[in-house]
Amino acid sequence: MSFASETKKELTHMDVSDSDAKVELAAFIRMNGAISFSNQLVIMDVQTENAAIARRMYQLLKDLYEVPIELLVRRKMKLKKNNVYIVRLKSGTRGILEDLRILEPPMTFTKSIDRGFVKKRSAKRAYLRGAFLASGSVNNPETSSYHLEIFSVYEEHNEAICALMNQFDLNARTLERKNGFITYLKEAEKITEFLSIIGATSALLHFEDVRIMRDMRNSVNRLVNCETANLNKTINAAVRQIDNIKYIQSTVGLEALPERLREIAALRIANEDVTLKELGEMLTTGQVSKSGINHRLRKLDQIAERLRSGETPAQVGLKISNS
């Protein structure tokens, strides 16, 4: 079962007050409900592929309204042959839709969220919970990117959901998709806040555990990569230094170097694997710091490059013995 499915399953077990149940129902029906007319009856079908969600919608309707409710199961014939669960109302539909602020007399469907319906903080939470159950999704925190979204067919309703989420400072944004609109979150911290808002405590804790472990692994990897890069840089520098010193040795001899450069050159080619700090401690003329050793080695690099470019030892400042 996916992380999103586990989250929704957790939400279907929540106990809520009657007022919050109405708000949750309103969000779900607005997004997943369909109205049809037959023999002067207004029939409402609320559809989902999630059995636990279907049971919750059925139970909430049954607890709130004394009307006959049907729970039907259909099987998809295309693509994934999943079951489709339909909660159907054949009587009292108009009154229920008006009570849920989805329908206004005589028969006008509202396009946004009734502000009075979500005045209380708990009602705001309930509406977002219903919207997420209806058409929400959230990436597994172990995947490469964090993403939570709620899909809506209608732009006005999508904007209302975004505004409702941002009343909780979630930094939600909207985006148009091929068949509708989404309100989405990309920040891990905001996703955990949203899960807390809708009451998905277990999902929140799992998300945070995985996120912390993932961030720790990323930090370790960055540290290892940094240390590896530094090691490679050190090795490459040592190889270059030794090559340059050997070039000086083969062309003019180390004896042509000033004493302070001659000693470090001899130590470097005799101790290829030691660090700059260790080289500094080997000098017979007195210990020299890492920066001091590095400065001398850079001077040797410059001498080698100038000799390679065709300059004479005298031009470089070297004295060649005639003996």
Curated annotation (Swiss-Prot):
Coiled-coil portions: none
UniProt keywords, alphabetically: Cell cycle, Cell division, DNA-binding
InterPro entries reported in the protein's UniProt record: Homing_endonucl, Sporu_reg_WhiA_N_dom, Sporulation_regulator_WhiA, Sporulation_regulator_WhiA_C, WhiA_LAGLIDADG_dom
GO biological process, one term: regulation of sporulation
Gene3D superfamilies reported in the protein's UniProt record: Homing endonucleases
Matching Pfam families: HTH_WhiA, LAGLIDADG_WhiA, WhiA_N
GO MF assignments: DNA binding
DNA-binding region, residue intervals: 275-309
Family, as annotated: Belongs to the WhiA family.
Stored NCBIfam families: DNA_bind_WhiA
Described purpose of this protein according to its UniProt entry: Involved in cell division and chromosome segregation.
The protein, known as: Probable cell division protein WhiA
Originating species: Listeria monocytogenes serotype 4b (strain CLIP80459)
Gene that this sequence comes from: whiA
